[in-house]
Design a protein with these regions (language model features):
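Primarily the internal scaffold of c-type cytochrome electron-transfer domains
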Residues: 1-64, 68-196
Length: 197
């Protein structure tokens, strides 16, 4: 089922709320028993959803950045149908240089910030999962349900960034915002299970 009623609903929070309300799960985590969701490569949602990326706000499309201008034999101009990394195509980079003095360097920085944080939070998420798996049989039902919901939410926010494929480059602010939400969930989970964050 499509959870969207418009671009404003294309956010990790709105998607999570939609599936929470439905009680939907993609699978049950084998170690914790948490009802899990799988983010499904949310490139479009990351660029156009919610508050939108800065490039989407300016009217740029996927083709503007990833499909180089080309010319047919008769001189007709069109966008190539070959999807490329924009930093590896001189024709695309030429269009970008008016606003971006060092786009390749900026992308590397965004991606490093995002992947470093993904790895840091993955380790914290893994520790939370292991602790929850160890404690689940000794927790009362309400605490167990809360701990599982935290696992579901933290992993979904993390996964939303992890599987988006741009490593933060499509919308660096949103990537960090979703990783912040993952971290907030984990802090609550660590406190709930008496773990040191």
């Amino acid at each position: 089922t499509n959870p969207y009623t418009g671009l404003e609903g294309m956010t990790a929070e709105a998607i999570l709320a939609y599936y929470d309300e439905m009680g939907f799960k993609d699978w049950e985590h084998t170690e914790t028993g948490a009802p899990m969701l799988k983010a499904q490569h949310p490139e479009f949602e990351t660029i156009y959803g919610g508050a939108q990326s800065s490039m989407a706000k300016q009217g740029y499309t996927c083709a503007d950045c990833h499909m180089a201008p080309a010319k047919a034999e008769d001189g007709t101009e069109y966008s190539s149908h070959n999807l490329v990394n924009p930093t590896e195509d001189p024709a695309i980079m030429e269009k970008c240089e008016g606003c971006h003095a060092d786009l390749p360097g900026q992308i590397v920085q965004w991606q490093k910030e995002t992947t470093d944080r993904e790895h840091e939070l993955a380790a914290k998420l893994d520790a939370y999962i292991k602790t929850l798996a160890e404690q689940k049989d000794s927790l009362d039902e309400a605490t167990l349900e809360q701990a599982r919901q935290i696992h579901r939410h933290a992993q979904f926010y993390w996964d939303y960034v992890m599987v988006e494929n741009s490593e933060g480059a499509h919308n660096p602010g949103l990537a960090q915002e979703n990783l912040d939400k993952c971290e907030d969930e984990l802090k609550a989970g660590y406190a709930l299970l008496n773990m040191t964050y």
